[in-house]
């Protein structure tokens, strides 16, 4: 089985047991900018559940022009507040 096939099968299993629908705006009104480090599960690290936050990931966990665009949409259209933005850089990234 290819990695793509495995991911598609995992997605199908997830969809079968998904307890939704969840509203599009995050329930905790928080947006997190995080490093794309595959070792880090941002939701678990921060104690978040599905639907509670927007997680925006990129190399270095820094706010770039693209990050600003994503944060602006998160705030203006989907209700996160500026004071709740957080960055979670990791060591050795």
Please give the residue ranges for each predicted region.
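Short HxH-centered metal-ligating active-site micro-motif
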Residues: 51-93
């Amino acid at each position: 089985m290819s990695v793509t096939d495995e991911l598609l099968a995992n997605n199908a299993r997830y969809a079968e047991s998904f307890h939704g629908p969840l509203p599009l705006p995050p329930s905790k009104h928080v947006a997190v900018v995080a490093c794309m480090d595959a070792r880090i599960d941002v939701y678990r690290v921060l104690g978040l559940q599905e639907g509670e936050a927007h997680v925006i990931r990129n190399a270095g966990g820094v706010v770039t022009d693209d990050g600003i665009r994503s944060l602006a949409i998160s705030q203006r259209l989907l209700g996160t507040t500026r004071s709740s933005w957080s960055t979670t850089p990791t060591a050795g990234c």
